[in-house]
UniProtKB/Swiss-Prot annotation:
FMN binds at residues 12-17, 59-62, 97-106, 132. Its EC number is 1.18.1.-. InterPro entries: CysJ-like_FAD-binding, FAD-bd_FR_type, Flavdoxin-like, Flavodoxin/NO_synth, Flavoprot_Pyr_Nucl_cyt_Rdtase, Flavoprotein-like_sf, FNR_nucleotide-bd, NADPH_Cyt_P450_Rdtase_alpha. PROSITE patterns: FAD_FR (PS51384), FLAVODOXIN_LIKE (PS50902). Belongs to the NADPH-dependent diflavin oxidoreductase NDOR1 family. In the N-terminal section; belongs to the flavodoxin family. Residues 210-449 form the FAD-binding FR-type domain. The keyword Cytoplasm applies. It comes from Xenopus laevis (African clawed frog). It is found in: Cytoplasm, Perinuclear region. This is NADPH-dependent diflavin oxidoreductase 1. NADPH-dependent reductase which is a central component of the cytosolic iron-sulfur (Fe-S) protein assembly (CIA) machinery. Transfers electrons from NADPH via its FAD and FMN prosthetic groups to the [2Fe-2S] cluster of ciapin1, another key component of the CIA machinery. In turn, this reduced cluster provides electrons for assembly of cytosolic iron-sulfur cluster proteins. It can also reduce the [2Fe-2S] cluster of cisd1 and activate this protein implicated in Fe/S cluster repair. It is an enzyme of class 1 (oxidoreductase).
Length: 600
């Protein structure tokens, strides 16, 4: 009897859903299932009609949006012309990850579960709705749900006679194993020249994650006051000859690197020679090694460019890490962090102080020394690319991309300040230096009106103003007035980004600007207050002239408060009832006249 096939599909923005899909995959192997795991947008969705057992793991981002790597799938699965029985052969389960402090908690998982059922698929269980706000995190829901899932699945597909579930004490082989060679790399290989020749874009097709463009840094300017608590940079990349095309609302992806100091510390802890050549090999011949892994040639490149040693380790890290421990005390502690009962302890140790993988390795020296190199790719996740809204227009500034970036740094109970991997690295790069930044462009969610006479209202506090600078530059370059910007920050003299630029455009009749400086007076003033103060203008632009409204910035409170202010304007100036104002904004959203791009 052949093994039962199981497909695990995930949509992940920060890596949590992908990590959970990996956990499911390992559990499937322990239950003797033939398991495939793919990101939703990497899976050929037309094949879904042939699948019989599928588990979906998906996060909800921003204001109820799907993760970037499931957006194409999301559009496809909600096509109106799909037959109502298209998935009648499928048994499925949906595992969602969200944050209950947001209004659209686990919106994607709930909607996907309902849609699959509408298309004839049979749910194995109610959708699981993991919550970041729970004191134990998503695992509070995930752990009992997985027990119920495997109980249900095994009742439908029992183990073959003579087979038993593989114990957690048994170490499964890694998906990709790392082999160290005695041969050393040369200086040109260590600097990455050979690696980059294989890895970079060929300049005839647009760069991508597989083939990024290595962009020189043209400028790196601090645009917040030097005595301001937050270091914000305007960074400009040279994209001459890259074949990159972008439009207002698009995002540039940046692949960051670990610092050489952290690379050296990691290699020292594991007794690795950075100069050793490496080969990455698949455990399964049918799972070829990804190109970016196959191109790696040295330990230093592996650690600097691939292993996310400065990320916060997840539970899965400790579940594997404890297998290598020869020390009884360390092993017991690692097992505690690995089990369901130890999650509160793990949260206090890792999540609350934001302790990194590298710092955990320091804390468990006996175990760290015994990590087999072959398991490094299984133990430590890949460095994820970071997304930045493009803050410039190709029309105004050809051959360049600019980003507005806050350098992440904060204190916890740990002595060493916490620093953002990507922002710290980018902020350290000097203009016209030798270091190149791997970048590529992805289409953004914002779409601006084609009609030059359509007014545009933009609400972008802080670094949320970045995509609107690109839009305003482009519209001005094409002679389009009717640009209205609501910008908010802490202080006029502290973090008023692009002040002179906005002033010049206002004087030329291209921009109407409203500012909210929250800390320049006793009572805090935010962009939503300015919206209410200018209700007549807003109603004229939105209600009379059918303008477009855009919101960008932090997803926590601002988007909802701005939306409430807009509803207030519709009621006051448009004479609408509260339900009518709600419906009006909903219809604007449906016709793309009301758009938002927010991030956590």
């Amino acid at each position: 009897m052949p093994q039962q096939n199981l497909l695990i599909l995930y949509g992940s923005q920060t890596g949590t859903a992908e990590d959970l899909a990996g956990r499911l995959s390992r559990e499937a192997k322990r239950h003797h299932f033939n398991c495939r795991t793919e990101a939703l947008d990497e899976y050929r969705v037309a094949n879904l009609i042939n699948e019989h057992l599928v588990i979906f793991v998906c996060a909800t981002t921003g204001q109820g949006d799907p993760p970037d790597n499931m957006k194409n799938f999301w559009r496809f699965i909600f096509r109106r012309n799909l037959p109502h029985n298209a998935l009648c052969q499928m048994d499925y389960a949906v595992l969602g990850l969200g944050d209950s402090s947001y209004p659209k908690f686990n919106f994607i998982a709930k909607k996907l579960h309902k849609r699959l059922n509408q298309l004839g698929a049979c749910p194995l269980l109610p959708a699981a709705l993991g919550d970041d706000q729970h004191e134990l995190g998503p695992d509070a829901v995930v752990d009992p749900w997985l027990k119920d899932l495997w109980s249900k699945v095994l009742s439908m597909f029992p183990l073959r006679p003579g087979l038993e579930i593989i114990s957690e004490d048994v170490l499964l082989p890694p998906k990709y194993s790392l082999r160290l060679l005695e041969e050393k790399v040369g200086q040109s290989e260590l600097s990455g020249d050979a690696y980059e020749r294989d890895f970079i874009s060929n300049n005839t097709t647009p760069p991508s994650e597989i083939h990024p463009f290595l962009a020189p840094v043209l400028s790196n300017e601090r645009v917040s006051a030097h005595d301001h608590f937050q270091d914000v940079r305007l960074i400009e990349f040279n994209i001459t000859g890259s074949a990159i095309q972008f439009y207002p609302g698009d995002v540039v992806m940046v692949q960051p690197r670990n610092s050489l100091l952290h690379v050296e510390q990691f290699c020292s802890l594991l007794h690795l020679d950075p100069l050793n050549k490496v080969v990455v090999e698949p455990s399964d011949p049918e799972s070829p090694v990804p190109m970016h892994l196959a191109a790696l040639c040295s330990v230093q490149q592996l650690v600097e460019r691939y292993l996310d040693i400065c990320s916060i380790p997840r539970r899965s890290f400790f579940q594997l890490f404890c297998h290598f421990s020869p020390d009884e005390m360390e092993r017991e502690k690692l097992k505690e962090f690995s089990c369901a009962a130890g999650q509160e302890e793990l949260y206090s140790y890792c999540n609350r102080p934001r302790r990194t993988i590298l710092e955990v390795l320091v804390d468990f020296p006996h175990t760290t020394r015994c990590i087999p190199a072959t398991f490094l790719l299984e133990l430590i996740p890949q460095i994820r690319p970071r997304a930045f809204s493009i803050a410039s227009s190709m029309e105004a500034l050809p051959n360049t991309i600019q980003i507005l970036m806050a350098v992440v740094q904060y204190k916890t109970k740990l002595i060493e300040p916490r620093r953002g991997l990507c922002s710290t690295w980018l902020a350290s790069l000097p203009p016209h230096g030798t270091e190149r930044v791997p970048i590529w462009v992805k289409k953004g969610s914002m779409k601006f009106p084609c009609d030059p006479d359509t007014p545009v209202v933009m609400v972008g506090p802080g670094t949320g103003v970045a995509p609107f600078r690109a839009a305003i530059q482009e519209r001005v370059a094409n002679g389009r007035p009717g640009n209205c910007l609501f910008f908010g920050c802490r202080g006029k003299s502290k973090d008023f980004y692009f002040e002179k630029e906005w002033e010049d455009l206002g004087n030329r009749g291209y921009l109407t600007l409203f500012t909210a400086f929250s800390r320049d007076q006793e009572d805090k003033i935010y962009v939503q207050h300015r919206i209410k103060e200018n209700s007549k203008l807003l109603w004229d632009l939105i209600g009379t002239k059918q303008g477009y409204v855009y919101i960008a910035g932090n997803a926590k409170l601002m988007p909802n408060e701005v939306t409430d202010a807009l509803k207030w304007v519709l009621q006051l100036e448009g004479g609408m009832s509260a339900p009518d104002a709600e419906q009006y904004l909903a219809s604007m959203e449906k016709s793309c006249r009301f758009q938002s791009e927010t991030w956590s």
